[in-house]
């Protein structure tokens, strides 16, 4: 039998080294499938490969994790200093040209779009690395997100699509349960998720100094989560309620001017916010207030939104929103009421109507008059404005345009606010913009999230705080106004969920 020239010329010592290396590598990689390391014929001694593993293990211990679905995943998760970084050997990425094709392709398995970090509580979605939790609410949580491409931090709100579809803004609320849609209705009815995408496309195009900017939205089709990326405002909410040191009257006036301009801009875009309150008003670096958190907002058609559902925070709800009459009510007037409650909080550090029980709170909102404490003393003009904003009749309640002209707001005309035409321009979106309003995360991101849960030995939502159920309540503000700090920079979340109270679902 003839032997090939390559085999005849092979050094016996090299052949021995090859066999020893094959046995050693097989022992180290017995849990992985793949090509036999000895097939290359020039493997170095096993100590060369071991040296590339031990230093990495000393500086960054390899976490012990269960294998989930495929070998690709374990390769993607391989820590720094592993055999993928060896300069020689069957899995090296060095200049050797005699490696097996399968071994050569292994480094390309690692994705730069979706990956999971070895650090605790860190998941990466596309270019965003999710870090600590900075807020929470009834519809999801807010996490600090680091954009590696831009070297910049954002706030990523993780929302439940099921809850979003139930409460998110539609042109009209769906009919009551059990009723059927009328025959011969509108020519085109958008699917629920399409309606959400349409409104997201509008929110992405909103551009106003007093409205928080929505950067982009990521969607994982295989999961319930929807990820909204917002500008990060590190100064946080304008105030936490209750507050022992409320704002001076002049500071409250300046903040109200910002809120009214932002609210007028939203109404111009045919959006009602439905959850105006101090924790949803964030301070920018320039000291101006920005309206945030559109989790229960509504888009409307015509001159005003005609609403029939209850949403928002109980202590900030208008009487008509909690009425048992079943009649529809104005969305714009709803926002004015909530802004009036917010203004009251600014100067008194608490809500005008307080009770630990939801039914008692509703009764006070609908029936009791607004009471002004003796301290701190405020001007009669401010009291007049608050009473007009907290008019229990939405038909006679003051509107945004009249608030802008109120003597307390303008200092009797000395500081007029810009007209609607000067600071509002209607945003229109095309079908293409609606189509591209949400970026889809590759479906195998689900596997990454599952791996994160397995690593934490928890099968719950990795973004959901454990104490959420303990803090949820329908009463307000008593048990719901958890924090007592106030003032600028009380905390550093952008778009926190709900702190005065969680939005009612």
UniProtKB/Swiss-Prot annotation:
The modification Asymmetric dimethylarginine is found at residue 78. Its EC number is 2.7.11.17. The keyword Nucleotide-binding applies. The modification Phosphoserine is found at residues 67, 74, 100, 458, 475, 492. Changing residue 463 to D: Loss of binding to Ca(2+)/calmodulin. ATP binds at residues 134-142, 157. Calcium/calmodulin-dependent protein kinase that belongs to a proposed calcium-triggered signaling cascade involved in a number of cellular processes. Phosphorylates CAMK1, CAMK1D, CAMK1G and CAMK4. Involved in regulating cell apoptosis. Promotes cell survival by phosphorylating AKT1/PKB that inhibits pro-apoptotic BAD/Bcl2-antagonist of cell death. The modification Phosphothreonine is found at residue 108. It comes from Rattus norvegicus (Rat). This is Calcium/calmodulin-dependent protein kinase kinase 1. Appears to be autophosphorylated. Phosphorylated at multiple sites by PRCAKA/PKA. Phosphorylation of Ser-458 is blocked upon binding to Ca(2+)/calmodulin. May be phosphorylated by CAMK1 and CAMK4. Transmembrane segments: none annotated. Activated by Ca(2+)/calmodulin. Binding of calmodulin may relieve intrasteric autoinhibition. Partially inhibited upon phosphorylation by PRCAKA/PKA. May be regulated through phosphorylation by CAMK1 and CAMK4. The autoinhibitory domain overlaps with the calmodulin binding region and may be involved in intrasteric autoinhibition. The RP domain (arginine/proline-rich) is involved in the recognition of CAMKI and CAMK4 as substrates. Belongs to the protein kinase superfamily. Ser/Thr protein kinase family. One of its GO terms (biological process) is intracellular signal transduction. Changing residue 458 to A: Decrease in phosphorylation and partial inhibition by PKA. Almost loss of inhibition by PKA. One of its GO terms (molecular function) is calcium/calmodulin-dependent protein kinase activity.
């Amino acid at each position: 039998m003839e032997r090939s020239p390559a085999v005849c010329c092979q050094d016996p010592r090299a052949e021995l080294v090859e066999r020893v290396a094959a046995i050693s590598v097989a022992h180290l990689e017995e849990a992985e499938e793949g090509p036999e390391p000895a097939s290359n014929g020039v493997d170095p001694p096993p100590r060369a490969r071991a040296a590339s593993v031990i230093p990495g293990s000393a500086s960054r211990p390899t976490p012990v994790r269960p294998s989930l679905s495929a070998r690709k995943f374990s390769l993607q998760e391989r820590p720094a200093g592993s055999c993928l970084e060896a300069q020689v050997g069957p899995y090296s990425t060095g200049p050797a040209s005699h490696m097996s094709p399968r071994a050569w392709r292994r480094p390309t398995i690692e994705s730069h779009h979706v990956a999971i970090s070895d650090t605790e509580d860190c998941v990466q979605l596309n270019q965003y690395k999710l870090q600590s939790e900075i807020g929470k609410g009834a519809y999801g949580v807010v996490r600090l997100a680091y954009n590696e491409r831009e070297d910049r931090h954002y706030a990523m709100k993780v929302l439940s699509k099921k809850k979003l579809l139930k409460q998110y803004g539609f042109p009209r609320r769906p009919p009551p349960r059990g009723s059927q849609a009328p025959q011969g209705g509108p020519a085109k009815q958008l699917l629920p998720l399409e309606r959400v995408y349409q409104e997201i496309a509008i929110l992405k195009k909103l551009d106003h100094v007093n409205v928080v900017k929505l950067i982009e939205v990521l969607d994982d089709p295989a999961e319930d989560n929807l990820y909204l990326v917002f500008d990060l405002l590190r100064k946080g909410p304008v105030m936490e309620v209750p507050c022992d040191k409320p704002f001076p009257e002049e500071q409250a006036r300046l903040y109200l001017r910002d809120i009214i301009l932002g609210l007028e801009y939203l109404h111009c875009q045919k959006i009602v916010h439905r959850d105006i309150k101090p924790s949803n008003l964030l301070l920018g670096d320039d000291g101006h207030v920005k309206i945030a958190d559109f989790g229960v907002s509504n888009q409307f058609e015509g001159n005003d939104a005609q609403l029939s559902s209850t949403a928002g925070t109980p202590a900030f709800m208008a009487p008509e929103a909690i009425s048992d009459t079943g009649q529809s009510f104005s969305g714009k007037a709803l926002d004015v009421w909530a802004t009036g409650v917010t203004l009251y909080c600014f100067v008194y550090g608490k809500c005008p109507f307080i009770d630990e029980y939801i039914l008692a709170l509703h009764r006070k909102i609908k029936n009791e008059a607004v009471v002004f404490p003796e301290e701190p003393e405020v001007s009669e003009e401010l009291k007049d404005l608050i009473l007009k904003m907290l008019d229990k009749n939405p038909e006679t309640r003051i509107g945004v345009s009249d608030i802008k002209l109120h003597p307390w707001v303008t200092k009797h005309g000395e500081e007029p606010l810009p007209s609607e035409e000067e600071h509002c321009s209607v945003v229109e979106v095309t079908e293409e913009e609606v189509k591209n309003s949400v970026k889809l995360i590759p479906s195998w991101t689900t596997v990454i999230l599952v791996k994160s849960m397995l690593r934490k030995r928890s099968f719950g939502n990795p973004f959901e705080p454990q104490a959420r159920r303990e803090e949820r309540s329908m009463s307000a503000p008593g048990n719901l106004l958890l924090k007592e700090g106030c003032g600028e920079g009380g905390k550093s979340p952008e778009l926190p969920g709900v702190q005065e109270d969680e939005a009612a679902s």
